[in-house]
Every structure is written in structure tokens, then in C-alpha cells.
Amino acid sequence: MAKPCAAFLVFLCLSMLILSIPDISCQMNDCDCDHDHRCGEWEDESHGNCKQHHLRVVCTCTLDCLDISSTSNA
């Protein structure tokens, strides 16, 4: 369940980055995300209930970008 959520957050961050670059049109393709999870702090010594979770997500994506700077014939 965490993997799709993390992938969406990465997509959202990259989309904001793309929108902030003028005169370039980019499309994100072929994202491959890996994640791992571990407990950072246990509620008790029995390791039964995790109090603090650590999630690491690493995504590799391909960006296809075209320069669309002012090329009009006006």
C-alpha cells in the first residue's frame, strides 16, 4: 500500500520541478520504484508493536524533454 503512495509523491515532486523549468516540455516515463521498511522505535522490548516506522523509497525514471523555446516564424 505504501509503494503506490510513495510513487505518487515522487511523481508530484518531479511534476512541480518540470513546471518550474521554462521553455522545456518533459514527459516522465518508465518509473521503477523500490522501497524498504523498518521499525525505528519499538513500543516495548518484545518487538511486538512498532512506534516509529522508517520507509525508504528510491525511484528511477526516464524524462523525455523537448526544447520548446521561442521558435515561431512571426
From Swiss-Prot:
Organism: Arabidopsis thaliana
Disulfide pattern: 26-50, 33-59, 39-61
Similarity-based family: Belongs to the DEFL family.
Protein name: Putative defensin-like protein 12
Compartments, as annotated in UniProt: Secreted
Recorded superkingdom: Eukaryota
Gene Ontology cellular-component terms listed: extracellular region
Lineage: Eukaryota, Viridiplantae, Streptophyta, Embryophyta, Tracheophyta
Segment forming the signal sequence: 1-26
Entry keywords, A to Z: Antimicrobial, Disulfide bond, Fungicide, Plant defense, Secreted, Signal
Residue ranges that the Swiss-Prot or TrEMBL entry lists as coiled coil: none
Any GO BP: defense response to fungus
